[in-house]
Amino acid sequence: MSDAEEEVVEYEEEQEEEDWSEEEEDEQEEAVEEEDGEAEPDPEGEAEAEEDKAEEVGPDEEARDAEDGPVEDSKPKPSRLFMPNLVPPKIPDGERVDFDDIHRKRMEKDLNELQTLIEAHFENRKKEEEELISLKDRIEKRRAERAEQQRIRNEREKERQNRLAEERARREEEENRRKAEDEARKKKALSNMMHFGGYIQKAQTERKSGKRQTEREKKKKILAERRKVLAIDHLNEDQLREKAKELWQSIHNLEAEKFDLQEKFKQQKYEINVLRNRINDNQKVSKTRGKAKVTGRWK
């Protein structure tokens, strides 16, 4: 029911209540008028009532009254108690109130309010169900995202472990190769020491002949001995790969020797500095001891 219809129904109810109140006031006024009409004494009726009373009394009473003498007329007689008749209120025959219509309108109003509440309840329930469905969807989506993130994290961890394993294997391989190279160098050094006498003899002969080589000539000679002619025109693809691996291995060995020599040079330099500092400290101590002895002697 709309607000306009509710206002119309309320206005009709107020009008009906006003009509009822006016009718009740009219009925009360009519009842008061009837009571006033019954309260007024009718002289003719009183006279007839007195006559009937006198007839009922009889001659004996008249004789008794005659003996007693005349009664004083001026004495007031007690009045009868008046009980008004209660008249039920009458419903006027004019415009009658349709209680069925009022009840029906009230029922329709209650029914409309109940229908509105039911619709609001179902709308709220529908919204709650939609929110619950959306919440479940978000939970499932978040769960899938977490599973994907966990899978990516596991893959990255697996790749990292593989890289660490490969790096560890590569280091072990390099360490083994370095040890093998060290053993080879040691063996080569021992073999060179065996032929050291030939080198000494060759140097003595060169010294005797008076021919002295400069450092640049020595360097060129050493490089010429080490550097070989690269003949790769007659090699196929596999042989070229093997040759490239061999050259790379030789470069790697040279770099390793260079690194070892640099570390050895640093160590020797450090030892020289340590020895020099020790010598300087010993010299200072010896000088102070000598001065102390001289001063003590002169005292």
UniProtKB/Swiss-Prot annotation:
S-S bonds: none
Gene3D superfamilies in the cross-refs: 1.20.5.350
UniProt source species: Rattus norvegicus (Rat)
Single GO term (MF): protein-macromolecule adaptor activity
Keyword Transferase: no
Signal peptide start and end residues: none
List of residues that carry N-acetylserine: S2
Protein name stated in the entry: Troponin T, cardiac muscle
Function text: Troponin T is the tropomyosin-binding subunit of troponin, the thin filament regulatory complex which confers calcium-sensitivity to striated muscle actomyosin ATPase activity.
Family per similarity comment: Belongs to the troponin T family.
Post-translational modification: Phosphorylation at Thr-214 by PRKCA induces significant reduction in myofilament calcium sensitivity and actomyosin ATPase activity.
Ranges annotated as biased composition (Acidic residues): 1-71
Basic and acidic residues: compositionally biased ranges: 137-185, 204-220
Residues with the Phosphoserine modification: S2, S209
GO process annotations (BP): actin crosslink formation; atrial cardiac muscle tissue morphogenesis; cardiac muscle contraction; heart development; muscle contraction; muscle filament sliding; negative regulation of ATP-dependent activity; positive regulation of ATP-dependent activity
Residues recorded as bearing Phosphothreonine in the entry: T205, T214, T295
Region (Disordered) location: 1-97, 137-220
CC per GO annotation: cardiac myofibril; cardiac Troponin complex; myofibril; sarcomere; sarcoplasm; striated muscle thin filament; troponin complex
InterPro entries hit by this protein: TNNT, Troponin, Troponin_sf
The UniProt record lists the keyword Acetylation: yes
Keywords from the named record: Acetylation, Muscle protein, Phosphoprotein
Top-level taxon: Eukaryota
